[in-house]
């Protein structure tokens, strides 16, 4: 039995890396060890700088600015993770999600967070994607607006019950 089957508990993988997606990630999904995954800029930075799997795409993107390069690499991996998790999501709408975080520099900019959240969600174009938003005053506004548009949201950086309540 699994935690999901035993107590309806879903584990999410907090790691994304291109080679991992094609090997262990597939395996732990198949074995029902995880039911979703999340990412953030720090995870991607570590993956991109420590894996040769990104070299070809990095070479093709080298003329772009850092944000564009990061987004292209991250979106490629998020789209792949969404595809790998899609069967889980089809079988249980509460599972099979992958999340991508908005630019952390937007944490105090509700309008910027909303704009970026809509853009990221649209560019990935998968029902099982969540936009990860920090639990700040601006983030609460963005969370409400994005969910009203039918965009899945993953609240992050919650350190108190008060913050958690404000995310609803």
Tell me the role of every PLM-derived stretch.
Residues 1-24:
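N- or domain-start disorder-to-order transition segments that initiate the globular core
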Residues 14, 127-136, 151-163:
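Catalytic beta/alpha-barrel core
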Residues 20-56:
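An N-terminal structural lobe/cap that precedes and organizes the functional/catalytic core
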Residues 33-35, 142-153:
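Glycine-enriched alpha-helix->loop->beta-strand junction motifs that scaffold or abut catalytic
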Residues 40, 100, 131, 146, ...:
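Conserved, mostly hydrophobic/aromatic
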Residues 43-140:
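Active-site beta->alpha loop and helix N-cap motifs at the rims of alpha/beta catalytic domains
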Residues 47-48, 162-168:
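Short, charged, surface-exposed secondary-structure boundary motifs
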């Amino acid at each position: 039995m699994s935690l999901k089957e035993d107590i309806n508990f879903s584990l999410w993988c907090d790691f994304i890396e291109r080679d991992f997606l094609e090997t262990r990630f597939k395996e732990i999904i198949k074995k029902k060890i995880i039911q979703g995954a999340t990412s953030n800029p720090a995870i991607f930075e570590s993956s991109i700088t420590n894996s040769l799997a990104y070299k070809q795409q990095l070479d093709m993107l080298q003329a772009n600015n850092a944000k564009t390069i990061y987004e292209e690499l991250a979106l490629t991996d998020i789209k792949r993770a969404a595809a790998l998790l899609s069967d889980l999501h089809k079988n249980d709408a509460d599972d099979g999600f992958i999340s991508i975080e908005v630019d952390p520099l937007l944490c105090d900019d509700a309008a910027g967070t909303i704009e970026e959240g809509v853009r990221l969600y649209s560019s990935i174009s998968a029902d099982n994607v969540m936009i990860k938003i920090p639990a700040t005053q601006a983030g609460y506004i963005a969370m409400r607006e994005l969910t009203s548009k039918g965009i899945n949201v993953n609240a992050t950086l919650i350190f108190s019950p008060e913050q958690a309540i404000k995310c609803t």
